[in-house]
Regions:
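Basic, polar low-complexity surface loops/patches
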Residues: 1-201
């Protein structure tokens, strides 16, 4: 037996976002399948059902209404998860064959914009740290307000001072960066490939 075209598309999209829970738009719902469905159903106390997927066993499945998705995203992000949102990129009524879908948004502690998830008394900073040529480049942004700061420091102590000053919700860094000491701040940390950082020769 072979996977259905829709489930093949789902798994290909999931493969491109392995560190995220995938919310896959199907009509008026975002659906989750397989392991993601098990995790989301448990974390959000949703009913876990199943869907025919072309295999002998049904794929575990759960879903949330698209119009209420922000509340569910807030709850998952507060538990430390990242969520990739795959939207329908064409009208299903006009699509020839399988509806095209693409990930249009990845929601993390530093990129969430839902008002219910943000505090009016505190910025929600996302901090990028790149370590090159024995220096730390630091960029800090609150995408909900547009506040943006950049600086460069030479010493780890100075870097930790910056992390303490901004208290970011999330830090992204290049692989050359050692995260020693940063974990003490209780912040979500992600290491991204060098290609995501503009390295000046």
């Amino acid at each position: 037996m072979a996977l259905s075209p829709m489930m093949t598309q789902y798994l290909e999209t999931k493969k491109e976002n392995p560190d995220c829970l995938l919310f896959y738009r199907l009509g008026d719902f975002y659906e989750m399948f397989f392991e993601d469905a098990k995790i989301v159903s448990q974390e959000l106390e949703l009913t876990l059902t199943g869907k025919d997927c072309g295999l002998e066993e049904r794929a575990p499945m759960c879903g949330v209404p698209y119009h209420a998705v922000e509340g569910y995203l807030t709850r998952l992000v507060s538990k430390g998860y990242k969520v990739a949102i795959a939207e329908q990129m064409e009208d299903p009524k006009l699509a020839k064959g399988l509806v095209k879908r693409e990930v249009v948004r990845i929601v993390t502690p530093g990129t969430i914009t839902s008002e219910s998830a943000l505090s009016i008394d505190k910025n929600n900073y996302l901090m990028g740290i790149v370590y090159l040529f024995d220096r730390f480049g630091i960029a800090t942004v609150d995408i909900s307000t547009g506040d943006f700061y950049v600086t460069e420091v030479n010493e780890t102590r100075e870097l930790l001072d910056e992390v303490h000053r901004f208290a970011p919700a999330e830090i992204i860094c290049n692989p050359s960066f050692s995260m020693s000491g940063i974990g003490d701040f209780g912040v979500t940390i992600s290491s991204l490939d060098h290609q995501y950082f503009n390295e000046v020769e």
